Amino acid sequence: MILSIESSCDDSSLALTRIKDAQLIAHFKISQEKHHSSYGGVVPELASRLHAENLPLLLERIKISLNKDFSKIKAIAITNQPGLSVTLIEGLMMAKALSLSLNLPLILEDHLRGHVYSLFINEKQTCMPLSVLLVSGGHSLILEARDYENIKIVATSLDDSFGESFDKVSKMLDLGYPGGPIVEKLALDYRHPNEPLMFPVPLKNSPNLAFSFSGLKNAVRLEVEKNAPNLNDEVKQKIGYHFQSAAIEHLIQQTKRYFKTKRPKIFGIVGGASQNLALRKAFENLCDAFDCKLVLAPLEFCSDNAAMIGRSSLEAYQKKRFVPLEKANISPRTLLKSFE
């Protein structure tokens, strides 16, 4: 088995993945959302301290799963990029300590690659090559995944990410953090869902294959300020619905542009924000229109988790892509390459 560790942001997670058949044997996770909610977003120093507390607790649960028999573990895998430096280092320190004390090889995994492999948790075979939309609080990307060693970025955000824009809109409406499920609930509760969009869809007339949410976010801010004296539940629902609709339409618009040139046969959607049901439905329709197979990460593995890191590290284990402890470092940025 491979013991995998994830600590790139505000989720502490450990998992055990069986090497021979890619089955997830154990998966434990502690979310920090309640600790960061009063700040309206993740506080790096607080996240780091909580990882220092939570990772050892999760390791104890792993020990119980193993009946304290660590001989079953053949390698340690750790997310080392991208993410918050102060949280990545917490996971890396644990991984190094385990690697040294158990005399096991160390595997460094890219967090974005891990999200791609969230599509294949509990599956020995992958469906690569495929294209992937990754939407989360930190990223809005289209990736082309040819195989484990060839995953490249073909489109990214010029400013805010998809998930981050939901957090900021929720904060404007004084509704808390994380904003994804809050704004989604507003949209679901809105009673006039067939109205024309009140907010502009970003980059509608731009030829660039990219994402941008800052203009949409600013349009929401102006609407909130205009309605400040009467920002009741119905107004918030209307704003939430129209914002979400415009944000998803932007993703669809840009992905359609990509589809017209690349014509992928398989398209995946991953990342924490991919839990949004309206987004999933919109992409079902898009993929149907282009005769493209849609694959979705299971809802429980959309947000950051060690199970996806364990699954991706199986490929590294088979290829013996191990890293000496003295060369094991972190990076706040991904080293996945962008296509020219």
Curated annotation (Swiss-Prot):
GO CC entries: cytoplasm
Intracellular or extracellular location(s): Cytoplasm
Keywords assigned: Acyltransferase, Cytoplasm, Iron, Metal-binding, Transferase, tRNA processing
Residues reported in the UniProt entry to bind substrate: 134-138, 167, 180, 276
Molecular function terms from GO: iron ion binding; N(6)-L-threonylcarbamoyladenine synthase activity
Cofactor: how bound: Binds 1 Fe(2+) ion per subunit.
UniProt-listed GO biological process terms: tRNA threonylcarbamoyladenosine modification
EC number(s) from the headed UniProt entry: 2.3.1.234
Cofactor: Fe(2+)
Catalytic reaction(s) noted: L-threonylcarbamoyladenylate + adenosine(37) in tRNA = N(6)-L-threonylcarbamoyladenosine(37) in tRNA + AMP + H(+)
Binding site for Fe cation: 111, 115, 304
Family that this chain belongs to: Belongs to the KAE1 / TsaD family.
PANTHER family noted in UniProt: TRNA N6-ADENOSINE THREONYLCARBAMOYLTRANSFERASE (PTHR11735), TRNA N6-ADENOSINE THREONYLCARBAMOYLTRANSFERASE, MITOCHONDRIAL (PTHR11735:SF6)
Function recorded in the entry: Required for the formation of a threonylcarbamoyl group on adenosine at position 37 (t(6)A37) in tRNAs that read codons beginning with adenine. Is involved in the transfer of the threonylcarbamoyl moiety of threonylcarbamoyl-AMP (TC-AMP) to the N6 group of A37, together with TsaE and TsaB. TsaD likely plays a direct catalytic role in this reaction.
Protein name as it appears in the record: tRNA N6-adenosine threonylcarbamoyltransferase
Taxonomic source organism: Helicobacter pylori (strain P12)
